[in-house]
Structures are given as C-alpha cells and as structure tokens.
Amino acid sequence: MPQYFPPTPGGNATTLNITAATILKAAPGRIYTVSVVTAGTAVGAIYDSIALTGNTTANQLGTIPQAVGTYPFAGMPTASGIVIVPPTGGAVAVSFA
C-alpha cells in the first residue's frame, strides 16, 4: 500500500549541506526553514524556478542572510519549483514540502 505523507508545519523533506545552486524540487512546493550552518561572504537567494540559471528578482522569493542562524519562511508557496542559491562560500540546510 503506498504511503502518503501530507505536508506538515515544518515541511516533510530536508536537504542538508547545500553549498552550490541546487534545484530542491522541480514542482510546486513550500519553503519552511533555511538554516545557515556555515557563514558566507554574500547573501544567497530562494527562487520559484526549475532552472539553475536565468533567475532574477522577478521569481525570487527571498534572500538567505550570510550569517549563521535559522530563518523561517512560514510555508511560502512556489508555483514552479524550488531553487536554493546559498550564501557565497556558505552552507545551508532547508526544510520544504
């Protein structure tokens, strides 16, 4: 019997140690929390996209600060997909659905 895991308040998936631009999900989803675990030298970004290139402020959902910390995004929805660009030289962990 297939299992279905509905989205939970904190997301139902996590990707750790993101150090380069990454497509987390190539379908609509939600961003819950971004944790900067290694500080960077410039801010990163979250995009509503399914491509690693060509992203602009037109499809940017938010910025990822360069300082170590946990930053909530409260289940912000995406229409296309989820692309994470971590702070330059930094590493992040992301919870999403």
Residue ranges and their predicted role:
Residues M1-A97:
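Surface-exposed, low-hydrophobicity beta-strand/loop segments enriched in small/polar/acidic residues
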